[in-house]
Amino acid sequence: MASSEETPRSLAGKVALVTGAGRGIGKGIALELAKRGASLVINYNSAEKPAQEVVDEIAKTGSRAVAIKADITKVPEVSRLFQEALQHFGHLDIVVSNSGTEVFKPEEEVTEEDYDRVFNLNTRAQFFIAQHAYVHLRNGGRIVLMSSVAANMSGIPNHALYAGSKAAVEGFTRSFAVDAGHKKITVNAIAPGGVKTDMYDANAWHYVPNGKPGMPMEEIDKGLAAFCPLGRVAVPQDIGRVVAFLAHPDSEWVNGQVILLTGGSVT
């Protein structure tokens, strides 16, 4: 488990917007940024209560936060999200595009609706979040996009749709890093492996050799931890800490990179 040492408020005065921050990895990212003093915009689409609970949890750290509902698959909603964030806090310094969905489906069964649903959220939405971040961030800002270990992973069946949706984000990252350079904005992506969230609970068995639906979670954790030199699977805090580093001024020379977050796992 990630340690819980007290962290310095190294992001005091910064404002961060995190999409899909009401739960899972997004929540973990938001809390780590808040612990370092950043003010947070907690974006959510449907789960208002969990998002407000994150706002309340952030308040206990001494940082400020607001929850803003927006369906980021719709560009007008993305525009409104940024405008409301700016109206609330006055400026933006950090944008983390976290929202996503995962799918495992035999390729011959993938429908046009499946394709649109996955690419609209995992790919198209991330492009327009990054576009709006580029426009609205102050000079020296930070953009962090969400890829996945799956983007460059072979041997996982029925995963082409998801893997492709994340691979495109890695291309966005390298190109946006060039385009945003004149504003001294860095653009990076993170590519986590399995992280203990509700999405992990539903899908992690696919990554376990000989995994089956309904496998006990203890077996799944043990199976995946066996591939990791650190002997465990990730928790959202692990991902949040890396994003907190990328958000910090000290990370300025890290730009246009896709950072694999697997604890050294080899699968």
UniProtKB/Swiss-Prot annotation:
Entry EC no(s): 1.1.-.-
The protein's name: Hydroxynaphthalene reductase-like protein Arp2
Membership in a protein family: Belongs to the short-chain dehydrogenases/reductases (SDR) family.
Function summary: Hydroxynaphthalene reductase-like protein; part of the Pks2 gene cluster that mediates the formation of infectious structures (appressoria), enabling these fungi to kill insects faster. The product of the Pks2 gene cluster is different from the one of Pks1 and has still not been identified.
Domain of life: Eukaryota
Residues bound to NADP(+): 25, 45, 71, 98, 162, 166, 195, 197
Pfam families from the UniProt entry: adh_short_C2
Keyword terms: NADP, Oxidoreductase
Gene3D superfamilies: NAD(P)-binding Rossmann-like Domain (3.40.50.720)
A GO molecular-function annotation: oxidoreductase activity
InterPro entries named in the record: NAD(P)-bd_dom_sf, Sc_DH/Rdtase_CS, SDR_fam
Cited PANTHER family: OXIDOREDUCTASE, SHORT-CHAIN DEHYDROGENASE/REDUCTASE FAMILY (AFU_ORTHOLOGUE AFUA_5G02870), SHORT-CHAIN DEHYDROGENASE_REDUCTASE FAMILY PROTEIN
EC supergroup of this enzyme: oxidoreductase
Residues forming the catalytic site: 147-148, 162, 166
